[in-house]
């Protein structure tokens, strides 16, 4: 996912700046991706078209990266295998990027169903490895980050809630308690 899915989420000034640059350059800009960028927005909007009453929309992604061979993405980018201290130092750019993507998805859905986003709450949980293990991208040492669970909750007008959740695990054994999606019992 590259961003620019719904630039309006960052305010009218940001949107106007992008629109002016596109006009000036004689181009258009279309951000896309899998989630967010397609699944996190298109499926909920399609499903709401078949709904009579909506109070809560939950989109939950769960990805396991043990077979993904890119050290640059899994370890350097997502910070799997980093200590909590390293994460605190290195995570600002990663968290800002992810947060921007998932907030755009919330704002896009909200506009699609005709409600206003009042605020977005963010929640992050990190789980460390209980033992050393290897994944395709490299080593995950005991005590380093092995799973991440992020949740963005968009509190909207008309008492509607839009939740985007992303669960990233370095292995199937990392945070097995997160196998059930948020809000589903």
Annotate each PLM feature.
Residues 7, 32-35, 94, 98:
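Glycine- and other small-residue-rich loops at beta-strand/loop junctions that grip anionic moieties
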Residues 38-50:
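Alpha-helical support elements that line or immediately flank enzyme active sites
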Residues 48-184:
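Active-site-lining helix/loop region of Rossmann-like oxidoreductase modules
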Residues 15-19, 44-47, 106:
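Short amphipathic alpha-helical segments and helix-helix/interface helices
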Residues 5-7, 38-39, 126:
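Short secondary-structure capping/turn micro-motifs that flank functional sites
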Residues 2-5, 34-35, 62:
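Short, ordered loop/turn segments at secondary-structure junctions
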Residues 1, 29-32, 58-59:
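General beta-strand structural signal in soluble alpha/beta enzymes
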Residues 2-28:
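Rossmann-fold NAD(P)-binding glycine/threonine-rich loop
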């Amino acid at each position: 996912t590259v961003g620019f899915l719904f630039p309006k989420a960052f305010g009218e000034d940001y949107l106007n700046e992008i629109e002016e640059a596109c006009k000036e350059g004689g181009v258009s800009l279309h951000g896309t991706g899998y989630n967010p960028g397609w699944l996190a927005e298109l499926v909920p909007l399609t499903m709401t078209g078949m709904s009579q009453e909506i109070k809560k929309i939950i989109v939950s992604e769960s990805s396991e990266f043990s077979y993904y061979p890119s050290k640059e993405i899994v370890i350097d980018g997502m910070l799997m295998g980093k200590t909590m201290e390293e994460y605190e130092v290195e995570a600002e750019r990663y968290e800002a990027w992810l947060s921007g993507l998932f907030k755009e998805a919330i704002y896009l859905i909200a506009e699609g169903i005709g409600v206003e986003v009042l605020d977005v709450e963010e929640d992050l949980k990190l789980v460390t490895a209980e033992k050393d293990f290897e994944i395709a991208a490299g080593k995950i040492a005991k005590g380093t980050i092995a799973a991440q669970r992020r949740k963005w909750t968009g509190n909207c007008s008309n008492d509607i809630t839009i939740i985007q959740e992303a669960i990233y695990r370095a292995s199937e054994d990392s945070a097995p308690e997160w196998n059930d999606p948020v809000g589903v019992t």
